[in-house]
Swiss-Prot record:
InterPro entries: Daa-tRNA_deacyls_DTD, DTD-like_sf. Its EC number is 3.1.1.96. This is D-aminoacyl-tRNA deacylase. Keywords: Cytoplasm, Hydrolase, RNA-binding, tRNA-binding. It catalyses: glycyl-tRNA(Ala) + H2O = tRNA(Ala) + glycine + H(+); a D-aminoacyl-tRNA + H2O = a tRNA + a D-alpha-amino acid + H(+). GO terms for molecular function: D-tyrosyl-tRNA(Tyr) deacylase activity; Gly-tRNA(Ala) deacylase activity; Ser(Gly)-tRNA(Ala) hydrolase activity; tRNA binding. A motif (Gly-cisPro motif, important for rejection of L-amino acids) lies at residues 138-139. It holds the Pfam family Tyr_Deacylase. It comes from the Bacteria. It is an enzyme of class 3 (hydrolase). GO terms for biological process: D-amino acid catabolic process. It comes from Sorangium cellulosum (strain So ce56) (Polyangium cellulosum (strain So ce56)). An aminoacyl-tRNA editing enzyme that deacylates mischarged D-aminoacyl-tRNAs. Also deacylates mischarged glycyl-tRNA(Ala), protecting cells against glycine mischarging by AlaRS. Acts via tRNA-based rather than protein-based catalysis; rejects L-amino acids rather than detecting D-amino acids in the active site. By recycling D-aminoacyl-tRNA to D-amino acids and free tRNA molecules, this enzyme counteracts the toxicity associated with the formation of D-aminoacyl-tRNA entities in vivo and helps enforce protein L-homochirality.
């Protein structure tokens, strides 16, 4: 499972012009599943995001996790395009992405794992054409992958 995580002052996601998920200060996580991912991958990425220390303490050091931020939440957006492969040619191949039915179940597992860690989670709509609005903070952007390091 792969995630692009951005620290945000606020974010929302719309489907068909209607807001379906929103957070104030927190993290936006764009998340995709690989063909061979399983529950352990979803739990691993959720654990990393829950413990990610990217919020500043009183001294200005990034040492606080989301649980330490008053009113903080996660906006989780499913995004299979994180597995777009352009090593050959210019059109991305998505062969590495999990098929949609299994991916939706794993995405739901990921969201449940975040909530089980006490986080407030808003979501987009799986397989929908979404508009995502993020007010980046920093910016701080972190890449997480359950199978490899960046």
């Amino acid at each position: 499972m792969r995630a692009v995580v951005q620290r945000a002052l606020g974010a929302r996601v719309e489907v068909g012009g209607q807001v379906v998920g929103a957070i104030e200060r927190g993290l936006v996580a764009f998340v995709g599943a690989a063909k061979d991912d399983d529950d352990a991958d979803a739990d691993h990425v959720a654990s990393k995001i829950a413990g990610l220390r990217v919020f500043s303490d009183d001294a200005g050091k990034m040492s606080r996790a989301l649980a330490d931020v008053r009113g903080g939440g996660v906006l989780a957006i499913s995004q299979f395009t994180l597995f777009g492969d352009v090593r050959r040619g210019l059109r991305p191949s998505f062969d590495g992405a999990m098929e949609p039915v299994r991916a939706e179940a794993l995405y739901d597992r990921f969201v449940a794992a975040l909530r089980a860690r006490g986080l407030t989670v808003a979501t987009g709509r799986f397989r929908a054409d979404m508009r995502v609005f993020v007010e980046n903070d920093g910016p701080v952007t972190i890449l997480i992958d359950s199978k490899r390091t960046f």
